[in-house]
Regions:
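N-terminal strand-loop element at the rim of the active site
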Residues: 1-62, 222-223, 346
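A conserved mid-protein helix/loop that constitutes part of the nucleotide-sugar donor-binding site
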Residues: 4-12, 182, 186-205, 222-229
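Short His-centered aromatic/hydrophobic patch
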Residues: 79-85, 104
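Aromatic "clamp/platform" in nucleotide-sugar-dependent glycosyltransferases that forms part
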Residues: 245, 264
Length: 358
């Protein structure tokens, strides 16, 4: 299983749930091992692989059905495929899996050639799910066209992100960033949704004002090469750091001065919760649900605003003094411990119901 935002959220829950009561197995749509596979196996789970999701492929649907049919021990199937969440739930229903959860993670989708197909399958989710979850209100209402769903917070282990000046100094030294430099950061997959093209345009403008500024991009994805080409064409290659996938995101956030997130759409991004937990000012687009604001560190601009406006705001936010926000994150309901306990109890109660023990 890869190291994206959704996968990170699932691992946060998996690490903190009582695995003597609830165990997770993961079915992924990639035919190769991912970053989290070894940890999942070490924690007692299994990782199974299918080919890329293709609802029009007879062989794909056959493989999916055969997998579920071969695992009658599963009484709960929890699907995290957004618009396509109903597809595995359809075969779970056909194979008499009693508890089928669809989970919404986005408040829209990329409007590409697949968009009409996604909307078609979105309409069929509720036919096959008997429980609806969402990462936030906007995501749930968009995905399910109802307000009858449970919001499960994209919770994190907030203590791991608490601002630490020593870590900040060490990480900036590691990347050769001086104390007087502005370090802008972003964590996210190189995918159209994350709007890296505009992000680079914003940084390019900031760099004209502040030549001693840097941009750190954490992640991988299909658009990484084209973004690297754009950075090179703008002459910014010495000031843009591509870290790739990292297991120390909590420490990288300490090194940043402003977290930039100009997405085209989102559900409730866990990366914004992580950034706030690190006491990091966040500048987000008006397409990111404002419900992600759990502290006074989140600021919003329109995607229609100029790159000058965005660059000016980054400069302003870079002067904010960092602080410990752990209690604020905990009080907002986004610390993982209580959330994992709730999910554990939910699964156990459902399982008992499925076995007729209640």
């Amino acid at each position: 299983m890869g190291r994206g935002g959704l996968e990170t959220m699932l691992m946060n829950y998996y690490r903190h749930i009582d695995r003597s009561k609830v165990q997770f197995d993961f079915l992924t749509h990639r035919e190769f091992d991912g970053d989290y596979d070894k940890e999942i196996i070490d924690l007692g789970g299994n990782v199974y692989h299918l080919s890329n999701l293709n609802p029009l492929s007879t062989s794909y649907k056959k493989s999916l059905n055969e997998f579920i049919e071969s695992h009658p021990e599963y009484k709960i199937v929890h699907s995290h495929l957004d618009c396509m969440a109903g597809i595995p739930l359809k075969y779970a229903k056909l194979n008499n899996v009693p508890l089928r959860i669809a989970h919404a993670h986005n408040s829209n989708q990329t409007k590409d050639l697949k968009y009409p197909l996604k909307l078609f399958y979105k309409r069929n989710i509720k036919k096959n799910a008997n429980y609806l979850f969402a990462c936030g209100d906007e995501a749930g209402k968009w995905m399910f066209n109802t307000d009858k769903f449970k919001v499960l917070n994209n919770a994190i282990d907030a203590k791991d992100y608490t601002f630490n000046m020593n870590i900040r100094n060490d990480k900036r030294k590691e990347f050769g960033i001086s104390d007087d430099s502005i370090m802008v950061g972003h964590v996210g997959r190189f995918f159209p949704q994350k709007n890296h093209e505009f992000l680079i345009d914003i940084f390019n403008q900031l760099h004209k004002y502040h030549p001693n500024s840097y941009l750190m991009l954490v992640g991988e994805g299909e658009l990484k090469t084209s973004i690297q080409d754009k950075v090179k064409a703008l002459g910014l290659e010495d000031n843009v750091i591509f870290t790739g996938l990292r297991s120390d995101v909590n420490e990288l956030l300490q090194a940043m001065d402003v977290f930039l997130f100009p997405s085209l759409y989102e559900g409730l991004p866990v990366s914004i919760i992580e950034a706030q937990s690190a006491g990091l000012p966040c500048l987000i687009s008006d397409k990111v649900p404002i419900e992600c604001k759990k502290t006074d560190l989140v600021y919003q601009l329109s995607l229609e605003d100029s790159v000058n406006t965005w660059a000016d705001k980054i400069h302003e936010l870079s002067h904010i003094i960092r602080r410990d926000t752990y209690e604020e994150i905990k009080q907002s309901g986004f610390d993982i411990v209580e959330n994992a306990k709730w999910l554990e109890n939910f699964y156990v109660d459902l399982y008992k119901k499925a076995l007729g023990e209640e």
